[in-house]
Structures are given as structure tokens and as C-alpha cells.
Amino acid sequence: MGVNDFAIERVWGLQVLDSRGNPTVKAYVKLAGGSLGWGIAPSGASRGEREAVELRDGGGKWRGKGVSRAVSLLNTVVAPRLEGVDARRQAQIDRLLIELDGTPNKSRLGGNTTTALSIAVSRAAAAQARLELFQYLGGAGARRLPIPLLNVINGGVHAGNELDFQEFMIIPYGFESFTEAMRAAVETYGELKSLLKDRYGASAVNVGDEGGFAPPMRSAEEALKTLVDAVEKAGYQPGSEIALGIDAAASQLYSNGRYSVEGKSLSREELLSLYQRLVEQYPIVYLEDPFSEDDYEGFKAAVDALSTETIIVGDDLLVTNPQRVKEASALKAVTGLLVKVNQVGTLTEALEAIQAARDRGIVHIVSHRSGDTEDTFIADLAVATEALMIKTGAPARGERTSKYNRLLEIENILGYSAEYAGPELRGVMGRR
């Protein structure tokens, strides 16, 4: 018998840096046929308690954030077990990683180790198959480009200002192509920069972790009003062309049954009232983590009150976990799933979470992390899985624009067969 070109010949890893200058894991997979795949694990600032554990060294070097132990495990424990395995058997390989780790939260090998390696395997197999990664993962029918969610005003743990909610986003959905949507977003971002500089001074246009601005604002309403002004100044229609979104990251605001928002201690009901008022006043179609990750009742109340106008998205609540998706669906606690491969630690488990959501009528949104890298894997994943949206920051900073540039490239590759997901969101806006 001849050599299987897809057989894994060599696996290795090394320590590289993410966009915050923190170490992370990069994995390589080389196949017998000569193809090379790679993947880099991102890292979040606000993390759900049930996420896969990042394995870090501790101690004094790299301020305790080194990943040399994770890289060593990849090179000495994992690599020998993968040699000779067919890289097309993604699920088998990911199950082997889960088995080798042997913990419920990947605390032995580290979710950063397994994420980087899982991505690298898929990229190697796609290269050997002479396919674009999105086509390898999604098949010949993968042709829909997601709606970009652009985090252009930062708050919470992503910024040093007084805004409690973590992200304020523009959502250019009312366009015929991804390219047109990005043009509108970039123009709006530019107008926002000018507005903020005029109103708050030059320091207001310094950018945060995800490329958004961190102006000295104090209220969500102030941020949303400014976004509407920027959309209009750019020549677009708020609501019908560019909608708005919020990631409250409410777990960061929660303590002892109350939510600390804008100098007030709010009950679940009071916080929901705030969201209702904001949705009534502004074209908000996306609301992520409106309540704490354990507050299923809060999420359910948000779905009951707002889901005809706004997608209620679980991030910390669901942590890309298929079982959590099923539980939340049974309680009618979400209408959207945020997908972060490193939350669960393997591509296979992330795909299972997406399928669990799809089976239950829950849309999915593929997402970056605040500590990200030049790896563009999530752009291909979004197209492959027909994600409604992709969340990957402002149109600034290379680790953010790399994903947008990959999506622009994919749209170009697809040519006339490319579709844009924007029209799907018009149904939500049409109910306003």
C-alpha cells in the first residue's frame, strides 16, 4: 500500500504572543503529503467560569503567563499519539485530545493547547485536499458571508473608562454584500472617531483591546446616541442599514444578587427595564450576556420581553458547550449562541454546539477573543457553518482586520455565488 498523504507525520508547538503581548500556544501539523497546518490559541479577558482552562506556567517569567509547560505537553505527550493518524479524522483526533487530557475542563493539557492543535489539524487537512479552509469545513455549498459585529466603543474590562457594559457595536446588515457592509462600517468608524475627538478630546480616540475607542463616557445611552450620530454623519440610516448591539458582559457586574450599573445597584427586573428602554429608543438588534452566567431566569425574562426585536445571545452562559446549549434552549433562555472554539477546546465540540443550536432554532455568531492573533481561522469557520454574524472587533489593529480581510478574500473567491447574511436580519428589524 502507498503512503497516505493525509497521515500526520509531525506535530510540534511553540510559544508566541497574542495581541496583548501575552504568551500563547501555536501548534503545527505536518502531513506525509507535505502540507503544513498551524493554529494559534486566542485568550479572553472576561471568561466564563465553565470555559476550558488555559494552562499557564505561573512564576515570575512572562508575569506568570508563560505557556512553556503547555508547549512541552504538546511536544512530548500529544505529538507521539497523533503520528500516523489521518488528519481528515478531525473528530477522532479531537476525541483523542479529550481522552489524553482526562479532565472535564481540559486543565491537564490546557484548552489553549488543544485549541491550537485542533485548528492546525483542520488547516493541514484542507491544504492537503487543495481546498480553501471554509470549503473543506463546510463543503461546496459554503457561500454565505456573515454580518460583521464591530465593537467600536469599549467599556468594562476592555477599557479604562466608566462605561459598565463591555461593548457597543455597529451592525451593517442592510447591504447587498459583505464588501459593501464593511465599507459602511469603516466609514462610520471614521466618523465616530471625528465625533469623539471633537466632543471629548484627542485622548478619547485611543483604542482598546479590540480596536474600539474608549471615550470618557458614563452611560450606555451616551454611547448609543453617539453611535447613531456617527451612522447618520456617515450617510447611512440607523436601523434600516446599520443596527446596534451591546455586550453587557453582566457577569462582571454581578454580586450578591444585584447588578452594579452606572452607579446604581439594580435588581434583575430593574436591569431588564433598562434594556427595554434602550431597545425602545435605539435600533438594538443584538444583546449579549445581559445577565450573569448563572442567571437563567434573567436570560429567560430577556427572551420573553425582547426576542421579537433583539437576538438574546449567550456567551458566558453557554461557553460553546453543546450540553449548555441544550439546557438553555429547554428553558427558552437564549435565541443566539456565541461560538468561541477556545471556550470548549476543540473544533469538534464547537461544531457540536453549533449543531445543537441549529437543531433548536438558535442562531450562532462566531467570535474572536480580546487577546487574539493573526490567525484568521474564525473567518473560515463563520462561512463554513453559515454563521449569521461574526464578531471580531473594530476595523483597526491587525489581529482584527486580518479576519475582515480574510472574509473579503473569501467573498472574492466565491465571486457571483457569494451571498450576504444581511437579509436574514431584516426579519428582526421588520418587527420593530
UniProtKB/Swiss-Prot annotation:
Pfam family, one: Enolase_N
Function: Catalyzes the reversible conversion of 2-phosphoglycerate (2-PG) into phosphoenolpyruvate (PEP). It is essential for the degradation of carbohydrates via glycolysis.
Protein name: Enolase
GO BP terms in the entry: glycolytic process
Organism: Aeropyrum pernix (strain ATCC 700893 / DSM 11879 / JCM 9820 / NBRC 100138 / K1)
Catalytic activity: (2R)-2-phosphoglycerate = phosphoenolpyruvate + H2O
Broadest EC class assigned to this enzyme: lyase
GO cellular component entries: cell surface; extracellular region; phosphopyruvate hydratase complex
Residues at which Mg(2+) binds: 247, 288, 315
Entry cofactors: Mg(2+)
Family of this protein: Belongs to the enolase family.
Active-site residues from the entry: 210, 340
Pathway: Carbohydrate degradation; glycolysis; pyruvate from D-glyceraldehyde 3-phosphate: step 4/5
PANTHER family for the chain: ENOLASE
Main location: cytoplasm
InterPro entries: Enolase, Enolase-like_C_sf, Enolase-like_N, Enolase_C, Enolase_CS, Enolase_N
PROSITE patterns with a match to the protein in the record: ENOLASE
Recorded superkingdom: Archaea
UniProt-annotated location(s): Cytoplasm; Secreted; Cell surface
GO molecular function terms noted in the UniProt entry: magnesium ion binding; phosphopyruvate hydratase activity
